[in-house]
Curated annotation (Swiss-Prot):
Intervals of motif 'KMSKS' region: 257-261
EC class of the enzyme, as a word: ligase
Binding residues for Zn(2+): 15, 199, 224
Keyword Repeat: no
Name of the protein in its database record: L-cysteine:1D-myo-inositol 2-amino-2-deoxy-alpha-D-glucopyranoside ligase
Reaction catalyzed: 1D-myo-inositol 2-amino-2-deoxy-alpha-D-glucopyranoside + L-cysteine + ATP = 1D-myo-inositol 2-(L-cysteinylamino)-2-deoxy-alpha-D-glucopyranoside + AMP + diphosphate + H(+)
Gene name tied to this protein: mshC
Organism of origin: Frankia alni (strain DSM 45986 / CECT 9034 / ACN14a)
'HIGH' region, short sequence motif: residues: 17-27
Cofactor dependence: Zn(2+)
Motif interval(s): 'ERGGDP' region: 155-160
GO CC annotation terms, alphabetical: cytosol
Domain of life: Bacteria
Length: 413
């Protein structure tokens, strides 16, 4: 985050979902990280331009649609709508642009053509591949050995064993039309794009030259981000594609990373249907560093429900301790590589002091919460102490952490 301090506008690009199933907590944790990044940047005075793609044509989507007897476009539309509902429910700040691969086909074709013109692409049968030899910096993002790259490439959608390639690591740029698959016309023949070139083209078209922050899960570091950067840099004849990368750690359930293939998933939509306090769910996710893998359990949500209850009780008090200290502490922790658990601990300290001063019991009433995702600059002075302190802390929690401290009203009330 500190690398962006001098830029008036921060350009964020985050790799989005492949919409063939509902949003699980691993997805939610990933997008929460970049929601938090947006909030910190806006609070520090930056404008933010945020683009997120949607991989709305890809093998897993086509396979699921075929399995379920659905048109792949209908399946994608349904799951995209559910994903956006889940993100809104979790109070994620929406990207300025959601861009589907299907709508981006013309710009993707243009970038593939540029790579062909630069001699960085070649045919294997009717498919078109990118030559990693054209990208001298290939490998600098993931810092993996060649042996590691080959193993991971095979696990994550690559085809290192395909004959005819110049290098086993060369990624697919354009897949020639296959029977029963969607395809689009291009100068290289009808087909559809490879995975990595999609993000290269979308990011360039919507964000211009260099992306300030490129995001996604740790499983996207290689091959996806490595290859996307290589495509963009060779096409532009300049580097870097992105000034910084933030890769979000994996969330596990039952001892394994949450994954659609394994089926060990906790869905946001299921928790919503069960009437889960979504402020508590957001707190449960925020209580983990984005840099370390962690395990989800129901007890985390139970603890978060109790925690948000204490926070709501504290901000409903008629007065409280000075809020300037907690405001400074939350900003300091978030500026340190988005240390959300540290920021929550700072709020806990203020809440404990407020409840102790009030005798430990909650007081009725509610606090008006400020507009989420803005800036707290200018808050302070006499307004940060006494009767104004609870409202300022509520606004802090809303604006910087995205947690709504309005009392939860029972269904049907």
């Amino acid at each position: 985050m500190r690398a962006l301090d001098s830029a008036p506008t921060a350009h964020l690009y985050v790799c989005g979902i492949t919409p063939y199933d509902a949003t699980h907590l691993g997805h939610a944790f990933t997008y929460l990280t970049y929601d938090l990044a947006q909030r910190v940047l806006r609070d520090s005075g930056h404008k933010v331009l945020y683009v997120q793609n949607v991989t709305d044509v890809d093998d897993p989507l086509l396979e699921r649609a075929d399995r379920d007897g659905l048109d792949w476009r209908d399946l994608a539309a349904r799951e995209i709508a559910l994903f956006r509902e889940d993100m809104t429910a979790l109070r994620m700040l929406a990207p300025d642009s959601y861009v589907g691969v299907v709508e981006a086909i013309p710009m993707i074709v243009d970038m593939v053509a540029e790579l062909v013109d630069r001699g960085a692409a070649y045919h294997v049968d009717d498919d078109l591949y990118f030559s990693v030899a054209a990208a001298p910096a290939f490998g600098e993002i993931s810092h993996l050995s060649r042996a590691e790259m080959l193993a991971i490439c095979a696990e994550r959608g690559g085809d290192p064993g395909r004959g005819g390639k110049k290098d086993p690591l060369d990624p697919l740029l354009w897949r020639a039309r296959r029977p029963g698959e969607p395809s689009w016309p291009s100068p290289f023949g009808p087909g559809r794009p490879g995975w990595h070139i999609e993000c290269s083209a979308i990011a360039r078209h919507h964000l211009g030259g260099v992306v300030d922050l490129q995001g996604g899960g740790t499983d996207l570091s290689f091959p996806h981000h490595e290859c996307s950067a290589a495509h963009a840099e060779v096409a532009a004849g300049a580097r870097p594609f992105a000034r910084s990368y933030v890769h979000t750690a994996m969330v596990s359930l039952d001892g394994h990373k949450m994954s659609k293939s394994r089926g060990n998933l906790e869905f946001v939509s299921r928790l919503r249907r069960a009437g889960t306090d979504l402020a508590a769910l957001r707190l449960a996710l925020l209580d983990h560093r984005h840099t370390a893998d962690w395990e989800w359990s129901a007890s985390l949500l139970t603890d978060a429900v109790a925690r948000v209850g204490r926070w709501r009780a504290a901000v409903a008090l008629p007065a409280g301790p000075d809020a300037q200290g907690v405001l400074a502490a939350v900003r300091e922790r978030l500026a340190d590589d988005l240390d959300a658990p540290g920021a929550l601990a700072a709020v806990d300290a203020w809440v404990d002091a407020a409840l102790a001063d009030a005798g430990g019991g909650p007081v009725g009433g509610s606090v008006g919460v400020g507009s989420s995702g803005g800036s707290l600059r200018g808050s302070g002075g006499a307004a940060s102490a006494g009767g104004e302190a609870p409202a300022l802390v509520a606004r802090l929690v809303d604006t910087l952490l995205g947690v709504d401290l309005e009392p939860v009203r029972p269904r049907g009330s």
